[in-house]
Amino acid sequence: MLAALPGLYEENLSRLELHKRFTESINTPDDSSGDAYILRQNGKIVAYALPISGQGFWAPIKAVIGIKADKKTITGIAVYQQNETPGLGAEIARAAFTEQFRDKVISFDGQPINIKRPGAVLGGSDVHAVTGATQTSTRLENIINTGLKEWLSKMSGRDNRK
């Protein structure tokens, strides 16, 4: 989860230090957060961590999407459970794929995020699919968009400053 949020995850930190950062900075989900975890700094909401899950091509996929307090900008995505084809669909969990989501803007017209074929021209809400993993990419796009739409619906009209 920390990898999806800004400024919390560093590879060289011990598990104890990572756990400390999590417990000191992250509030557990509740109705006011639309069931997302909340990252607070100096009492203000900095970002949300939205757990998402759904059926991949071969097995369930579970991930966390980090979203800035503006509810419009993605801070990152971390795929923590998947059993897709090694070297193909399993690439969704690698940084080469997930880093594409950083600073993408959630679209409010149509799909919040679009995963497009490799080589396609990308807009502000688009990332490239994993080459050779069309089914996994399509299913992950559906999981992400279902999770974002449900969360945005829950958060509609809520005050960010709490």
Explain the meaning of each model-derived region.
Residues M1-K162:
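Flexible, solvent-exposed loop/hinge segments and secondary-structure transition points
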